[in-house]
Amino acid sequence: MSPSLNEPERLNRQAQGLACNECRARKLRCDRVRPTCGTCESLGVTCTPNSVRQPRGPRKGYLKTLQSRISALERQWNGQQKAAGGSPGESPPCSEGGQTLRAVSESTSDGVHDEDHANGARPPSSQSSIEQPILQPTVSLDGISALHGFAPVNSPFAFALPGTDPSKTVDLFSHMECFPSMPTKLDPRAYVPQQLTPNSTMSNGQFDLPTDLSVTSEFQLPELMKADLSHLYFDRVHPFAPILNKRRYFARAARPVSEQGAMTCLQHAMWTLAAWLGSQFKHIQKDLYIYTRGLLEKWELNMHPGNPPIELAQARLFLAIYEIMQVNYERGWLSAGRCFRLIQLMKLHEIDVPDGISESGISFGEIEERRRTFWMAYSLDRFINLINKMPLTLNEQVIFTRLPAPEGAFQRERPVQTQFLSEFMAGDDDLQIVSPFSACIVVMTISGRCLSHQQQCMVERAYGGMPQDFITRHQWLEGILMSKGKAIVDCISNDLDDELTDPMLLFTNMAAHATTLLLGMTMQTGLCNYESLISGFEERATEAAQKILHLCQRLNECGYFKVHPFTPIPLVFCAEWAQGRKNQNPAFEPLHNSMLCSLRDLSVVNMLAETCLARLNDSNPQMETDMSKSQS
């Protein structure tokens, strides 16, 4: 049958206008007679025509058609690139494939308009959209393929492609609003493959972190993994950060989640640090860290600033250690500063003042946890500032908190009264046996004093100060180092087997000898004209460097994950000492190379060692050559 015969039938098939509500509800054909149609007149009801047409939804399969277009463009462009050997940066030509896709798009759009016209209605957008545009990428089509290897930056659709200006972003979906039948709430991210990309993994040993660390969903861990991480914490983290009572922790962890409060932050910080020290948890390490950081930020925003819980300070402490070891030193240093301010806000430096918290009726285990949290932050303050030679935050002279109790008494919650740090430093040289944690605190106190002495020396030289003040202060520190430092080393070195199994003992022994080197390097910079004093101290410093080398050989027996994480600090001091002398005395070169090799080995799991190597490389451009020689 010819089209001329069909045309009148098609046009007269349905009257102009909209069907009334009664006919639409009964699904009857409305004759559209006004004011009352035939159906309503026969039923005796009021005829109410529907004057507002409901907007039409998207056509079925439209999104699949859009995806197939992009895939066709990718295949076409990749085929042309393989055939012609063109560069990836060229723009794709508009070829037959592109015309075919345009025809498909136009026919699809025309089909929508024809159907609307047949129903007697036209969407408002169709008046100005006679010819719909084709989705044309603003970048090369191999760039679309590269979409699978790049993550969003700041906005969901902005991408930085290889070989382009990173400051200029492109939007692959910038023209989607031109399609009238596109769903209004389309989220194109649902069609972008969610894969780990170079921007979301470690780059040059450092995390490229997202800018938004807010907590959007719960980071779910299986219960078995949580238990494994908790026990891994007490096995590998607690030996160098002994601030939690194991029995009290598991009792608090058994409470319902709704009653834990800041304990949730502490748990995630513990698990984050434990995941770093367990190779089986590397796949969750970064995600767990990001979630923990966001959890802490969210908790602090809702926290009452006058009474922060102790768990928050402990979580901040663990997170700062993790960032120093696994993210980068600067980020960890800044996080440690926030932890120190929180410690000061809680007044943990004066726990044992008269009528203080120690006399408030709180259990010994809880008070001791607070003491140990403060002393761990105090030690961390010395650890991190020995690297960059920055001023200390926690002042030794205002501390009114007793030294930690022995580990056995702490875990069994048996009250033991210990000395104050000032009493210990001012007492006689006949020291009783102290715990490894207390010994480390004493050694780091001496190191902090030597660091302040070095900084004060630089200021005095800038202002033309008299060297006599420097000599008096230097001799006083040397006397403390010879008495307290030597007594501590002798005390913790009685049992060599414990020194091998306890990372705190091994680190404290190395740190005590490194303090001797720090004091010696300060003397060289401050008393360059006093050869007699320098030569006398040179012998003691050389002996200390040899002892560090001897202790360094035991690191391999501990394993990567049981070495004290701040062990690179004494190693870098020893390497700097040998580096300044190997040119005059070749006997120091093996010592220097051994320190470099140890730092390089530790850098596999510890970014602080990598930071120390970078510091040595800045002062000695030939260090790479030295490391190559030491490996051969």
Swiss-Prot record:
It holds the Pfam family Zn_clus. Residues 77-130 are annotated as: Disordered. GO terms for cellular component: nucleus. Keywords: DNA-binding, Metal-binding, Nucleus, Transcription, Transcription regulation, Zinc. SUPFAM superfamilies: Zn2/Cys6 DNA-binding domain. It is found in: Nucleus. Signal peptide: none annotated. Gene3D superfamilies: Zn(2)-C6 fungal-type DNA-binding domain (4.10.240.10). GO terms for molecular function: DNA binding; DNA-binding transcription factor activity, RNA polymerase II-specific; zinc ion binding. InterPro entries: TF_fung, Transcription_factor_dom_fun, Zn2-C6_fun-type_DNA-bd_sf, Zn2Cys6_DnaBD. Residues 20-47 bind DNA. GO terms for biological process: DNA-templated transcription; positive regulation of metabolic process. PANTHER family: C6 FINGER DOMAIN TRANSCRIPTION FACTOR DBAA-RELATED, ZN(II)2CYS6 TRANSCRIPTION FACTOR (EUROFUNG)-RELATED. Transcription factor that regulates the expression of the gene cluster that mediates the biosynthesis of azaterrilone A and other azaphilones, a class of fungal metabolites characterized by a highly oxygenated pyrano-quinone bicyclic core and exhibiting a broad range of bioactivities. This is Transcription factor tazR.
